[in-house]
Amino acid sequence: MAPMGIRLSPLGVAVFCLLGLGVLYHLYSGFLAGRFSLFGLGGEPAGGAAGPPAAADGGTVDLREMLAVSVLAAVRGGDEVRRVRESNVLHEKSKGKTREGADDKMTSGDVLSNRKMFYLLKTAFPSVQINTEEHVDAADQEVILWDHKIPEDILKEVTAPKEVPAESVTVWIDPLDATQEYTEDLRKYVTTMVCVAVNGKPVLGVIHKPFSEYTAWAMVDGGSNVKARSSYNEKTPRIVVSRSHSGMVKQVALQTFGNQTTIIPAGGAGYKVLALLDVPDKSQEKADLYIHVTYIKKWDICAGNAILKALGGHMTTLSGEEISYTGSDGIEGGLLASIRMNHQALVRKLPDLEKMGH
């Protein structure tokens, strides 16, 4: 006889037991999932270009904290880049051919920098999507902890936290920009870069020069440690372009701006953006415009785009379109970057340079 005179049928007992087992299973499976996540057993990415997409329930992240970690990541990656170059053991190999037919080179500097940068950011912000140039090998996974200290120069410029949904954030990492020049020991062109985009728009960028140990950073509507120069020459500009197609751009530039125009061949997109700014680095050349006419990857340009945008400058395709940092990892329409100039007037003035890159 059941208590209180209630009689339980065999069917009722079975239903009650099944409900109890269901509750226990739900609780236990949730506990196990949490433990697997804690110890990194939940499937770290093995893909070359991207980490896992952000979870829909990832909460929020603080852009000020992301800036601090991005600066640290760029510096840590730069330490690896410098160490490998100074050892003179690069383990250089080709990943294939670029669209222009050149070797797409990779070195130990690329790989080791990528590992430090990716896992520092991924450990600090596990719920955001991270896109990186090099393959992320799960066998080389590291847990690299951030001490949650924000540098004073960032606190001075960005005085309050800036929370955004984690699912809106995409991080773009270039662990070694100007690999070709790196293999040639042309050190001044080499940078490491981190960019954070929110809903596809670049909002913070970091460009670090490992061999001079100079770091530029900026946050849109936040602050920066770098500034524009006091003046630019719009009539006969100095134009910084890739070493591989300087002749192609020079011909058009002379026709457009006249014989006094100067073409500066250079390696690395990060270096070229810094050429437009007031950078206290004696090895850094100065330019008024940055033009690129061929296909380029977003991790090459996102950080520079964010810095220019934060300082009131512009980076667009050659036809004047804004660049979205979601979806595919490259853009076809070439680049025009400027600051303190009439950017759209420059777009209209230039001929269809993008067609020359094909």
From Swiss-Prot:
Pathway entry: Sulfur metabolism
> Which of this chain's residues are annotated to bind Mg(2+) 3?
E133
Keywords for this protein: Acetylation, Glycoprotein, Golgi apparatus, Hydrolase, Magnesium, Membrane, Metal-binding, Signal-anchor, Transmembrane, Transmembrane helix
Question: Could you say which protein family the record assigns here?
Answer: Belongs to the inositol monophosphatase superfamily.
State the top-level EC class.
hydrolase
Name the SUPFAM superfamilies on file. Answer: Carbohydrate phosphatase
Q: What is its EC number?
A: 3.1.3.7
- Protein name (record): Golgi-resident adenosine 3',5'-bisphosphate 3'-phosphatase
Q: Its Gene Ontology molecular function terms?
A: 3'(2'),5'-bisphosphate nucleotidase activity; 3',5'-nucleotide bisphosphate phosphatase activity; 3'-nucleotidase activity; metal ion binding
Q: How is it modified after translation?
A: Contains N-linked glycan resistant to endoglycosydase H.
Which ranges sit in the Cytoplasmic compartment? 1-12
Subcellular location, principal: Golgi
InterPro entries, per database record: CysQ/Inositol_MonoPase, Inositol_monophosphatase-like, Inositol_monophosphatase_CS
Activity control mechanisms: Strongly inhibited by lithium.
- Source organism per entry reads Callithrix jacchus
Where do the TM regions start and end? 13-33
Topology check: give the Lumenal ranges. 34-358
Q: What cofactor(s) does the depicted protein rely on?
A: Mg(2+)
**Which positions bear N-acetylmethionine?**
M1
Residues annotated for AMP binding in this entry:
S242, H245, G268, K272
Glycosylated residues, chain numbering: N259
Q: In the UniProt record, does the keyword Protein transport occur? A: no
What subcellular compartments does it reside in? Golgi apparatus; Golgi apparatus, trans-Golgi network membrane
Provide the active-site residues from the annotation. D110, T179
Which reaction(s) are listed as its catalytic activity? adenosine 3',5'-bisphosphate + H2O = AMP + phosphate
**Region of interest called Disordered, as start-end residue ranges on this chain:** 85-106
Q: Where does Mg(2+) 1 bind?
A: E133, D174, L176
